[in-house]
């Protein structure tokens, strides 16, 4: 009888531990990392969270790496996965994009930084199977990009929107068809080409906001400047055709390297934008204007049904994000930079509370 009681107690304790380690308490990353590509997916009852590449706390070019960490919800800690391959034989990338589709993770683009400070956009992209932990190389992006937005549609298509390509921004919407494994061009992004923008998609509706444009002048050198603008795109019967509309900006002040995600509030689709900085910056967190950048705490919520912005309470400030994840209906950022440009190992919970 005593043995049965002990056995039952152990089972109850284990069950309670698994619950505690679900969405309520996600473990920190094995090490601080920022500008990392993140995604999550659920397969046969197990949820996987992955962090691809990024930059470490030193924030120098030598701190950029190819490390991959994966956490299985309900388990302790993270596992080290094989590093992301590189056809260019670089030691790491930042500003890559990652999504989950058809029980796999996909990682696209990003850039490496050489010892002399020069940057190179990565041409190769990969699919990672979280079960076998094997990479499959995809066909190269027609125009390689970093600091772009990646969105999935109909569990088949992936859109790579705008971003930087070696020498300048592009206005392209490059579509990858996971059925045919081919790339094609969708209706181009209608605004100024930007990098470091954020976006999310619900159904056939996508929303892209902000980023940094390269502006040209007659009396001075070109300069990187924030671009406060939001564009709503609706995909038609043809997945390559997007009807774009300019919509009102929620504040009139752009944020750089924030992240966005689709979630539901009271059963309605909402596109939520979190984090970023109002002072665009280099990969070390120092602004292009020479001033240290600080993360923003504002939360923007766009109602897809009502086609308008809703007010929400602030959240924990964090910047240098590539994307967000949703676990058990709760939104988290993974890594990034917090106050003082400190690279973080934390998975920060961002409750969405409408005002």
Residue ranges and their predicted role:
Residues 2-13:
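Bacterial N-terminal signal peptides that target proteins for export
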Residues 1-2, 18:
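Non-catalytic, low-structured ubiquitin/UBL-interacting segments
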Residues 12-22:
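Hydrophobic h-region of N-terminal signal peptides that target proteins for export
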Residues 21-355:
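Kelch-like beta-propeller repeat domains
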């Amino acid at each position: 009888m005593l043995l049965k009681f002990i056995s039952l107690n152990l089972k109850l304790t284990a069950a309670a531990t698994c619950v505690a380690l679900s969405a309520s308490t996600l473990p920190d990353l094995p090490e601080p990392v920022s500008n990392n590509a993140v995604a999550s997916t659920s397969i046969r009852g197990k949820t996987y969270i992955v962090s691809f590449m990024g930059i470490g706390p030193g924030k120098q070019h030598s701190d950029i790496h190819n490390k991959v960490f994966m956490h299985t919800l309900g388990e302790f800690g993270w596992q080290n996965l094989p590093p992301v391959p590189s056809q260019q034989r670089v030691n790491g990338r930042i500003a890559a994009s990652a999504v989950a589709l058809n029980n796999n993770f996909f990682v696209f683009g990003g850039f490496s930084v050489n010892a002399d400070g020069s940057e190179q956009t990565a041409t190769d992209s990969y699919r990672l199977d979280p079960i076998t932990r094997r990479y499959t190389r995809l066909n190269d992006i027609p125009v390689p990009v970093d600091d772009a937005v990646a969105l999935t549609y109909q569990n088949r298509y992936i859109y790579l929107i705008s971003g930087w390509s070696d020498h300048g921004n592009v206005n392209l919407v490059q579509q990858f068809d996971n059925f045919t494994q081919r790339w094609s061009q969708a209706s181009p992004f209608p605004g100024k080409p930007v990098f470091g923008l954020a976006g999310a998609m619900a159904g056939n509706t996508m929303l892209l906001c902000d980023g940094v444009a390269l502006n040209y002048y007659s009396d001075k050198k070109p300069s990187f400047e924030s671009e406060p603008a939001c564009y709503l795109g609706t995909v038609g019967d043809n997945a390559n055709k997007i009807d774009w509309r300019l919509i009102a900006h929620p504040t009139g002040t752009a944020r750089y390297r924030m992240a966005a995600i689709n979630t539901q509030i009271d059963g309605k689709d909402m596109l939520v934008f979190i984090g970023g900085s109002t002072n665009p910056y280099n990969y070390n967190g120092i602004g292009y204007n020479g001033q240290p950048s600080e993360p923003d705490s504002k939360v923007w919520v766009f109602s897809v049904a009502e086609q308008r912005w809703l007010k929400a309470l602030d959240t924990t400030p964090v910047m240098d994000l590539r994307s967000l994840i949703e676990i058990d209906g709760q939104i988290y950022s993974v890594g990034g930079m917090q106050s003082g440009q400190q690279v973080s190992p934390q998975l920060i919970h961002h409750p969405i509370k409408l005002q």
